[in-house]
Amino acid sequence: MTDFTPREIVSELDRFIVGQADAKKAVAIALRNRWRRRQLDDALAEEVTPKNILMIGPTGVGKTEISRRLAKLAGAPFIKVEATKFTEVGYVGRDVEQIARDLVEIAINIVRETKREDVKAKAHAAAENRVVDALVGPNSSEATRESFRKRLLAGELDDKDVEIQLADSGAGMQMLDIPGMPTGGAGVINIGDILGKGFGQKTKTVRMKVKDAYEPLINEEADKLLDDSQITADAIKLAENDGIVFLDEIDKIAARSDARGGDVSREGVQRDLLPLIEGTTVATKHGSIKTDHILFIASGAFHVAKPSDMLPELQGRLPIRVELSALSEADLKRILVEPEASLIKQYVGLLATEGVSLDFTDDAIDALAKLAADFNASVENIGARRLQTVMEKLVEDISFTASDRSGQEITIDADYVAEHVGTLAKNADLSKFIL
């Protein structure tokens, strides 16, 4: 869990996301409140629940990216789900409790990776012994083993093929659903696990290079040193206290005030979300998880529906409202150059692998931003995603012939942009007349 201050969290988000100061401020405060809650005594901490956030703004302005970067920064279990993927309990489809189950699985992976790092030195030594066994046999003399160990550490044997025994996860027999029980959770039996425990762990022989054998062997040896029950307990605790759920397309399940009749994927899903966001206990195959302290960030464009079209109870469970503004031409220009992994840096890096040097002039960047802004205004406003369309069209010819142009330096200016992307603008004018 990070102990960054809100100001530090915002400056960290600024490295990757342009603008949207209000949204960054809201999520920074929400993350800091988690740290503050940890400083309280247990009785008071139990009463402090996260203030869930509703982000309102057009597509492509940074709603998802802000949440994703926040979770990465916090090292927290994070899951992004589309609200439209779920159906009301009792109908065919995924029910909303699957969100909590998936969050536990993500938390288990995070905890397992952390604990693997703690035992990596021991696991590496054990993996090294298994590679030496595969090279010279388990009954070889100590002198022979030491000789091969030195060559192994020096990297002389990296490209040599070895046969190693790895645990077989049993892909053939996986899961059995128990009728009447929730899918993907407590109502699922892993037949492979049962048979594995009854008849001992199955192994399979795999042939690979020495340098490629280390990773699976280290993971296998590390898992032998870990306590699965402790990992599960820690993961459930992590998911309960630090979990972040990003509910996208929340506006698509808001029934418009002028709509008539019920809808399985709308009001019913909203009703099912109420206890999950408010705080409930969900049964998973790893144990029960309480959702009281999980942070929910809902987002939607709300082009057709309005936030007030959602159930009043659901509105009340999303008390913090943040409006994200549409991107201007100046914002699009900043997005092209300012983030650490901006689009221009990505394309320059990709083509540099072929020996092609790309150089973008300032007027080219201005022209790209103007084109993207014009497309958004005239066709459909898809925000920063429009830049990907424009950039891909711009470097299409260079990308196709890059392997034949190694060593060349190519300067992209405003004229080059007009020549290669200008046709898109003409086609866009006609697109509205095509069915």
Swiss-Prot record:
<dbReference type="InterPro" id="IPR004491">
    <property type="entry name" value="HslU"/>
</dbReference>
<dbReference type="InterPro" id="IPR019489">
    <property type="entry name" value="Clp_ATPase_C"/>
</dbReference>
<dbReference type="GO" id="GO:0005524">
    <property type="term" value="F:ATP binding"/>
</dbReference>
<dbReference type="GO" id="GO:0036402">
    <property type="term" value="F:proteasome-activating activity"/>
</dbReference>
<protein>
    <recommendedName>
        <fullName>ATP-dependent protease ATPase subunit HslU</fullName>
    </recommendedName>
</protein>
<comment type="function">
    <text>ATPase subunit of a proteasome-like degradation complex; this subunit has chaperone activity. The binding of ATP and its subsequent hydrolysis by HslU are essential for unfolding of protein substrates subsequently hydrolyzed by HslV. HslU recognizes the N-terminal part of its protein substrates and unfolds these before they are guided to HslV for hydrolysis.</text>
</comment>
<dbReference type="Pfam" id="PF10431">
    <property type="entry name" value="ClpB_D2-small"/>
</dbReference>
<feature type="binding site">
    <location>
        <begin position="60"/>
        <end position="65"/>
    </location>
    <ligand>
        <name>ATP</name>
    </ligand>
</feature>
<feature type="binding site">
    <location>
        <position position="385"/>
    </location>
    <ligand>
        <name>ATP</name>
    </ligand>
</feature>
<dbReference type="GO" id="GO:0008233">
    <property type="term" value="F:peptidase activity"/>
</dbReference>
<dbReference type="GO" id="GO:0016887">
    <property type="term" value="F:ATP hydrolysis activity"/>
</dbReference>
<dbReference type="InterPro" id="IPR003593">
    <property type="entry name" value="AAA+_ATPase"/>
</dbReference>
<feature type="binding site">
    <location>
        <position position="18"/>
    </location>
    <ligand>
        <name>ATP</name>
    </ligand>
</feature>
<comment type="similarity">
    <text>Belongs to the ClpX chaperone family. HslU subfamily.</text>
</comment>
<feature type="binding site">
    <location>
        <position position="248"/>
    </location>
    <ligand>
        <name>ATP</name>
    </ligand>
</feature>
<dbReference type="Pfam" id="PF07724">
    <property type="entry name" value="AAA_2"/>
</dbReference>
<comment type="subunit">
    <text>A double ring-shaped homohexamer of HslV is capped on each side by a ring-shaped HslU homohexamer. The assembly of the HslU/HslV complex is dependent on binding of ATP.</text>
</comment>
<keyword id="KW-0963">Cytoplasm</keyword>
<dbReference type="GO" id="GO:0009376">
    <property type="term" value="C:HslUV protease complex"/>
</dbReference>
<keyword id="KW-0067">ATP-binding</keyword>
<keyword id="KW-0547">Nucleotide-binding</keyword>
<keyword id="KW-0143">Chaperone</keyword>
<dbReference type="InterPro" id="IPR050052">
    <property type="entry name" value="ATP-dep_Clp_protease_ClpX"/>
</dbReference>
<dbReference type="InterPro" id="IPR027417">
    <property type="entry name" value="P-loop_NTPase"/>
</dbReference>
<dbReference type="Pfam" id="PF00004">
    <property type="entry name" value="AAA"/>
</dbReference>
<feature type="binding site">
    <location>
        <position position="313"/>
    </location>
    <ligand>
        <name>ATP</name>
    </ligand>
</feature>
<dbReference type="GO" id="GO:0051603">
    <property type="term" value="P:proteolysis involved in protein catabolic process"/>
</dbReference>
<dbReference type="GO" id="GO:0043335">
    <property type="term" value="P:protein unfolding"/>
</dbReference>
<keyword id="KW-0346">Stress response</keyword>
<dbReference type="InterPro" id="IPR003959">
    <property type="entry name" value="ATPase_AAA_core"/>
</dbReference>
